[in-house]
Structure formats: structure tokens, C-alpha cells
Amino acid sequence: MELKPPTRAELEEVRLWRNEILETLRTPYPLTEEMQVNFYDKVVCNPDSHHRYFSLHAGLSTFIGLGGLTNIEWENGLAEISLILSPQYRGSGYGRQAVSALIAKGFNDMGLSTIYGECYQCNPAIEFWQKITIEHGGYITMIPRRKLWQGQLYDAMHFTMWRQ
């Protein structure tokens, strides 16, 4: 799995994938093309941003998704992990490779000590994140009634992994 700087065209693909899975997101509103371009210019391309995003490539050139280490607290060595894959690559093992690459980037290259995340019970990827967290010796906490989606409340799973 190769991590590369994302391009504006790749982020447009990601926007379309993201808008198909709103129930899984902390901010469940669709993004417009203009919003995504603004995000690319002000966050992704900003070296002073507290967010680092990476285009995920399988092999030499196949773009499969976007990963991030976001909400970075440099002084505390903390970052939140994020991941979105093209629908055609979900469930294929690429997610596991992407998370391993992001964790290595965070711990080995960026000097982070803790990587955390959140996944809602209404997200089919919750089992994926449970397995990944356990494999990396992490800790899981369930937060009841954390996410409101279409009139129903869902629990959230918070997970934390530490540099070994």
C-alpha cells in the first residue's frame, strides 16, 4: 500500500463515495463539489493544518481510497484515523493494508504515540475496526446513544491504539 499526496481529482471521487454513506459519518450531510475544492485548498494543501490526508494506492497506480490522520495534537502525540475506500475495494483486504500503512506513518514518520477513532454501530465497518484495534493491542469503549440517524440513536465505538 502506497500513501501519496491526494489530487483534486481523487478528492472528487472520494466526495461521491462519501455522499453515498452518510449514515456512517460524524457530519451526515452531502458535500458539494465547491465544498470539496475548498477543503482540498484550505486543509489538504495547507502545511499548517492539523490534518494529514493520503491518497491510497494499491500497486503502482490504482487509486483505491483516502486515509487520514486528523485532528492532530502534536504536543500530545495524538491523531484520529480516518479511511474511505472505493466501493469496489471494500471487503477485499485493502482496508487492513491501508490502516497498517497509516498507523506506520503516524507512529514511525510523524512521531505520534496514540491513534484513535470512532465508528458508529450503523456502520457495517464496525467489525473491521474492532478486529484492527484488537490486532494492534488497542482499547475499545462503547458510548451509548451517540449517533442520531433518521430518527434512531446508535451506539459509537471509540478505539485507541498506542505505539508499541
PLM feature segments, named:
Residues 5, 30, 43-46:
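Short secondary-structure boundary/capping segments within folded domains
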Residues 14, 37, 43-44, 99:
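Extended aliphatic helical segments
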Residues 22-41:
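Conserved GNAT-fold acetyl-CoA-binding loop/helix
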